[in-house]
Amino acid sequence: ALRIHWASGRDYEGRAAEIIKDNLRAVGIDVTVLVLDRPSFIDKVFRNWDFDLANQLFTTGPDPSISVTPRYHTNQIKKAPFVNGMGYTNPEVDKLFDAEFTEVDRTKRAAMWRNIQQHLMADLPALPLFEVPPIHAASAKYRDIVMGSQGYIESRENAYMVR
């Protein structure tokens, strides 16, 4: 049976795993869904590469060089969390990653990223299934809470409570 792993605490990943299981069963493929605590998931998927499929939330942040490049660049094939655990390699994509990293012209960089996206969607080292919309909420008692693209991991160092 094909194994699909997901980390507890992210129920949307579990629901997606069950949908995948049902859809693959319909075409004769047996799937076992395995839910793991987050540390065990990271060990099994990223450190040990002991998985067939894994549901993993990827975020791109304000600059894709920071989060997308490590997930797909050949030089990031490592047994470590949140890098290229798929073992994906494409020399043309690597060249684009290397070039866009040093490109200062935003228009040229954007064109390079469109090209990278086209390659990744053709090669499918990871299959985007859904997007989790960011929801940010804070009590009106607080001021200067950063609500940016990174959501809950944004800095709160300047936040304060009005009394």
Question: Where are these predicted regions, by residue range?
Answer:
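Short, well-structured beta-strand/strand-turn elements
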Residues: 25-40
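Short, well-ordered beta-strand elements
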Residues: 1-9, 31-34, 52
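Detector for C-terminal structural segments
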Residues: 8-22, 38-163
